[in-house]
């Protein structure tokens, strides 16, 4: 190691022709402030203020000023989502599989059954902001593709659909916490003179279109009379369990959401038995206003269910409802031009329902007809531009007044990963389909995670310059044709080929809430990490001779032989499927003995970055300009890439410290040819990070500000510094001397900074050199009172403390992998016992 030191001096142009002396003399000089100033001038590192214009692009790296323009693909396919339903009794199923669970495993699984999200503040945005105008040239295409994506998610049971202020519907299998509206249900039966049996007999939608008015009015009268004694303060403080409705007869301006507003004016909830109220839009509005009123005013703990709903209420529209539907109004209107939407609407007789309802209706907390985040579509990933991915912007929960501090969770660092996974096992990785959408969310979180759209008419009206949105006129015949245009007509005709009758369905407004955890919230990665780590922990204990490990949705399995790995794969796959976890068998990758994981290649020899990252680094250096100031935001991107591979270089992170300093000062950075050559040489030769081995520590180092001491076996050494040094610097130098003189890869020290192996806070040149010398060295903490090198460092060689026998055990970080399992009783009486093909149980190295 010390031989490389001269090379280091030459590289940084520090040699002035004189031969370098011994390490004990030369190394302390690297902490000298004067030398650092001289080097900074030579390498042009200290010149932060520059007058030349900054460079904002280096290769593919750009600053925030010139972000890449997103490309819309009209041919995007909406990915299909399996009917994901994680089993509610997941803890019991795991216990049947492996016996009693550890406290850690239980705690993690309870966290996600169901997940909860309660921010302190939630900002509600108008529905117009539901779908972001991310592609200004493809507004209509983007609108329908996004609506189709949302519809697909709803059909797959990933979203709730807001039906009224206090009820929602969804598809798929319900969980026990999703309170189906049965206990406080309202099955409205009317007297025979109205000719109606009940709401259940109606075919289209929640309420019948034709005979709603009188039925509701008589019901309102009954429920109002029935609840009279309980009104007032008592009623609000002691909710009744009867399930009847405490509905005050007050005019409500709320409307059922999902139906276009009409210009028919205000509906009075007067209580009478008149059956003459047959104007359809008024009837619909009365019906839905009654619904939201009953929810809002219900004194029971539950809301109302019309429980004879067909799963998809997709009947043909009754004639009367046309007046309230923007889309169907075109049918009876005179075409305004050859590009009038009435030509499209008249193409088919049956446009299907204005609205669809889920298989189950549940009670939810009060949810406004608003959104809390916008959505837009992008390519699924850089390698798959054929499929789209939905981006949900819930950034309000990461900034400002509604900021939520997300829980921290342990991410395995490089050394822990290497200690754990660098072995002679044969590996495969599993692909979990839509991993985030496995974890159910409590319905109480729905009002905080709302997405949706205001409907095509309003969306187009907002974006077109010639239309006026006026609450009184909106939806009336006068401005119906304001949205007609050649561009809209052509777009809709093309989309009609793709979506058919669904164009009508998608043109209506909708509000959706998340039923499974969304990707755009900081809580989701935490929950996913807890979930997969708990499952892998169970798998590891069920198969102690194998290894299962996960980070987020990336799950890897390792076994001693290929045959054993395949049988493990079958058993684990069956177990995961029984829990309701969906795997994508086509994307299962068999890696052999070199595992590709988290951007690394991990083999028995250690860990290296994957090839595509190495190629990116080479490309970055090819494009890196010299003597030109580079925007600090671009420097952030460069440091992100180089920082990932820094542990594999000789000088490590300290080599990047000048770049870090410029980013912190928010100043441009100018690469000098020498500094670029130095970095380039560092990154062209990458060295693997090796697995740490357990062992006994027999080499100890200690220092005081004025001197250093070593204990190598029974040998003691000491030395003094030319000038007093800061204690951390002195301790680091002592550790370097111990490594250099003994060659030991295990050194005992009492300094926490040296133990941390983070040398970025030391003088730059010293940090680089120390990283070079101490690369691959493990440290053991020894208290000062017991440190055999303590006396030599204070100049006392005569006294000899007994040499400690300090064992070193490599750490696997906070991944809680090998907690000792509780004693497991014989939980499977008919279990088949067979000898493992390995004969010996594998333990972590």
From Swiss-Prot:
<dbReference type="InterPro" id="IPR001462">
    <property type="entry name" value="DNApol_viral_C"/>
</dbReference>
<dbReference type="InterPro" id="IPR037531">
    <property type="entry name" value="HBV_DPOL"/>
</dbReference>
<dbReference type="InterPro" id="IPR043502">
    <property type="entry name" value="DNA/RNA_pol_sf"/>
</dbReference>
<comment type="similarity">
    <text>Belongs to the hepadnaviridae P protein family.</text>
</comment>
<feature type="domain" description="Reverse transcriptase">
    <location>
        <begin position="359"/>
        <end position="602"/>
    </location>
</feature>
<comment type="function">
    <text>Multifunctional enzyme that converts the viral RNA genome into dsDNA in viral cytoplasmic capsids. This enzyme displays a DNA polymerase activity that can copy either DNA or RNA templates, and a ribonuclease H (RNase H) activity that cleaves the RNA strand of RNA-DNA heteroduplexes in a partially processive 3'- to 5'-endonucleasic mode. Neo-synthesized pregenomic RNA (pgRNA) are encapsidated together with the P protein, and reverse-transcribed inside the nucleocapsid.</text>
</comment>
<keyword id="KW-1090">Inhibition of host innate immune response by virus</keyword>
<keyword id="KW-0239">DNA-directed DNA polymerase</keyword>
<keyword id="KW-0238">DNA-binding</keyword>
<keyword id="KW-0945">Host-virus interaction</keyword>
<keyword id="KW-1113">Inhibition of host RLR pathway by virus</keyword>
<feature type="region of interest" description="RnaseH domain (RH)">
    <location>
        <begin position="693"/>
        <end position="845"/>
    </location>
</feature>
<dbReference type="GO" id="GO:0003887">
    <property type="term" value="F:DNA-directed DNA polymerase activity"/>
</dbReference>
<feature type="region of interest" description="Terminal protein domain (TP)">
    <location>
        <begin position="1"/>
        <end position="179"/>
    </location>
</feature>
<dbReference type="InterPro" id="IPR000201">
    <property type="entry name" value="DNApol_viral_N"/>
</dbReference>
<feature type="binding site">
    <location>
        <position position="431"/>
    </location>
    <ligand>
        <name>Mg(2+)</name>
    </ligand>
</feature>
<keyword id="KW-0540">Nuclease</keyword>
<keyword id="KW-0548">Nucleotidyltransferase</keyword>
<feature type="site" description="Priming of reverse-transcription by covalently linking the first nucleotide of the (-)DNA">
    <location>
        <position position="65"/>
    </location>
</feature>
<keyword id="KW-0695">RNA-directed DNA polymerase</keyword>
<dbReference type="InterPro" id="IPR000477">
    <property type="entry name" value="RT_dom"/>
</dbReference>
<dbReference type="GO" id="GO:0004523">
    <property type="term" value="F:RNA-DNA hybrid ribonuclease activity"/>
</dbReference>
<dbReference type="Pfam" id="PF00078">
    <property type="entry name" value="RVT_1"/>
</dbReference>
<feature type="region of interest" description="Spacer">
    <location>
        <begin position="180"/>
        <end position="348"/>
    </location>
</feature>
<dbReference type="InterPro" id="IPR051320">
    <property type="entry name" value="Viral_Replic_Matur_Polypro"/>
</dbReference>
<dbReference type="GO" id="GO:0006260">
    <property type="term" value="P:DNA replication"/>
</dbReference>
<dbReference type="GO" id="GO:0046872">
    <property type="term" value="F:metal ion binding"/>
</dbReference>
<feature type="region of interest" description="Polymerase/reverse transcriptase domain (RT)">
    <location>
        <begin position="349"/>
        <end position="692"/>
    </location>
</feature>
<dbReference type="Pfam" id="PF00336">
    <property type="entry name" value="DNA_pol_viral_C"/>
</dbReference>
<protein>
    <recommendedName>
        <fullName>Protein P</fullName>
        <ecNumber>2.7.7.7</ecNumber>
        <ecNumber>2.7.7.49</ecNumber>
        <ecNumber>3.1.26.4</ecNumber>
    </recommendedName>
</protein>
<dbReference type="Pfam" id="PF00242">
    <property type="entry name" value="DNA_pol_viral_N"/>
</dbReference>
<feature type="region of interest" description="Disordered">
    <location>
        <begin position="226"/>
        <end position="252"/>
    </location>
</feature>
<dbReference type="GO" id="GO:0052170">
    <property type="term" value="P:symbiont-mediated suppression of host innate immune response"/>
</dbReference>
<keyword id="KW-0808">Transferase</keyword>
<keyword id="KW-0255">Endonuclease</keyword>
<dbReference type="GO" id="GO:0003964">
    <property type="term" value="F:RNA-directed DNA polymerase activity"/>
</dbReference>
<keyword id="KW-0235">DNA replication</keyword>
<keyword id="KW-0899">Viral immunoevasion</keyword>
<feature type="binding site">
    <location>
        <position position="553"/>
    </location>
    <ligand>
        <name>Mg(2+)</name>
    </ligand>
</feature>
<dbReference type="InterPro" id="IPR043128">
    <property type="entry name" value="Rev_trsase/Diguanyl_cyclase"/>
</dbReference>
<keyword id="KW-0479">Metal-binding</keyword>
<feature type="compositionally biased region" description="Polar residues">
    <location>
        <begin position="234"/>
        <end position="243"/>
    </location>
</feature>
């Amino acid at each position: 190691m010390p031989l490389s030191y001269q090379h280091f001096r030459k590289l940084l142009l520090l040699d002035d022709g004189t031969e370098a002396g011994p390490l004990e003399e030369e190394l302390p000089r690297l902490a000298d402030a004067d030398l650092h100033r001289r080097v900074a001038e030579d390498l042009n590192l200290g010149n932060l203020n520059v007058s030349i214009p900054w460079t904002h692009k280096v290769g593919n790296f750009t600053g925030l000023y010139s972000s890449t323009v997103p490309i819309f693909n009209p041919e995007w396919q909406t990915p299909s989502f399996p009917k994901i339903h994680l089993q509610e009794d997941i803890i019991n199923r795991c216990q049947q599989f492996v016996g009693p669970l550890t406290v850690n495993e239980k705690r993690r699984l309870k966290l996600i059954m169901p997940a909860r999200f309660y921010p302190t503040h939630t900002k509600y945005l108008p529905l117009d902001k539901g779908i972001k105008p991310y592609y200004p040239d493809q507004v209509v295409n983007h609108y329908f593709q996004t609506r189709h994506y949302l519809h697909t998610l709803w059909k797959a049971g990933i979203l709730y659909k807001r039906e009224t202020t206090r009820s929602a519907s969804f598809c798929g299998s319900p969980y026990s916490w999703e309170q189906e509206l049965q206990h406080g249900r309202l099955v409205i039966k009317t007297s025979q003179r109205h000719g109606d049996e009940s709401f259940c007999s109606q075919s289209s939608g929640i309420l019948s279109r034709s005979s709603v008015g009188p039925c509701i009015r008589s019901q309102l009268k009954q429920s109002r009379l029935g609840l009279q004694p309980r009104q007032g303060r008592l009623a609000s403080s002691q909710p009744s369990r009867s399930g009847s409705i405490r509905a005050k007869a007050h005019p409500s301006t709320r409307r059922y959401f999902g139906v276009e507003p009409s210009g028919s004016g205000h509906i009075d909830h007067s209580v009478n038995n008149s059956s003459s109220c047959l104007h359809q839009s008024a009837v619909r509005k009365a019906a839905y206003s009654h619904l939201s009123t009953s929810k809002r005013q219900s004194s029971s703990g539950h809301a109302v269910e019309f429980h004879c709903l067909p799963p998809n209420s997709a009947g043909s529209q009754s004639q009367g409802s046309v007046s309230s539907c923007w889309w169907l109004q075109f049918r009876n209107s005179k075409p305004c031009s050859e590009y009038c939407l009435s030509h499209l609407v008249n193409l088919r007789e049956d446009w299907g329902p204005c609205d669809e309802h889920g298989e189950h209706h549940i009670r939810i907390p009060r949810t406004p007809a608003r959104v809390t985040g916008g959505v837009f579509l992008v390519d699924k990933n850089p390698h798959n531009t054929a499929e789209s991915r939905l981006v949900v912007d819930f950034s309000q929960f990461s900034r400002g007044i509604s900021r939520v501090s997300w829980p921290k969770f342990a991410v395995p660092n490089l050394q822990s990963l290497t200690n754990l996974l660098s072995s002679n096992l044969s590996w495969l990785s599993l692909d979990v389909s839509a991993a985030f959408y496995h974890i159910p969310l409590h319905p109480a979180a729905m009002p905080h995670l709302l997405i949706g759209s205001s409907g095509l008419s309003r969306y187009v009206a907002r974006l077109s310059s010639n239309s006026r949105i006026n609450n009184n006129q909106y939806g009336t015949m006068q401005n119906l044709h304001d949205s007609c245009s050649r561009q809209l007509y052509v777009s809709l005709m093309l989309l009609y080929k793709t979506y058919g009758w669904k164009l009508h369905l998608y043109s209506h407004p909708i509000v959706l809430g998340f039923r499974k955890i969304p990707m755009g919230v900081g809580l989701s990665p935490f929950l996913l990490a807890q979930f997969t780590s708990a499952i892998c922990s169970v798998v590891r204990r069920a198969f102690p001779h194998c290894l299962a490990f996960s980070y987020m949705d990336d799950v890897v399995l390792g076994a001693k032989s290929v045959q054993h790995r395949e049988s493990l794969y079958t058993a684990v796959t069956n177990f995961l499927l029984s829990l309701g976890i969906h795997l994508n068998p086509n994307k299962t990758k068999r890696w052999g003995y070199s595992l590709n994981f988290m951007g690394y290649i991990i083999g028995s020899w250690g860990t290296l970055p994957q090839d595509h990252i190495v190629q990116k680094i080479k490309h970055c250096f090819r494009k890196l300009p010299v003597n030109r100031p580079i925007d600090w935001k671009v420097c952030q991107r460069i440091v992100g890439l180089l920082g990932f591979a820094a542990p594999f270089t000789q000088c490590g992170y300290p080599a990047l410290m000048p770049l870090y300093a410029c980013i912190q000062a928010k100043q441009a950075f100018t690469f000098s040819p020498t500094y670029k050559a130095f970095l380039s040489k560092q990154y062209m030769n990458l060295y693997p990070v090796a697995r740490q081995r357990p062992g006994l520590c027999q080499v100890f180092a200690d220092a005081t500000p004025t001197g250093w001491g070593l204990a190598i076996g029974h040998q003691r050494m000491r030395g003094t510094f030319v000038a007093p040094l800061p204690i951390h610097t002195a301790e680091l130098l002592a550790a370097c001397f111990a490594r250099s003189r003994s060659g030991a890869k295990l050194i005992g020290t009492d300094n926490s900074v040296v133990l941390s192996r983070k040398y970025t806070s030391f003088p730059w040149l010293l940090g680089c050199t120390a990283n070079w010398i101490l690369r691959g060295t493990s440290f053991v903490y020894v208290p000062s009172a017991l440190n055999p090198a303590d006396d030599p460092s204070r100049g006392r060689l005569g006294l000899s403390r007994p040499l400690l026998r300090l064992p070193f055990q490599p750490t696997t970080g906070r991944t809680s992998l090998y907690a000792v399992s509780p004693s497991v009783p014989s939980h499977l009486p008919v279990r088949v016992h067979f000898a493992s093909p390995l004969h010996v149980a594998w333990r972590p190295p």
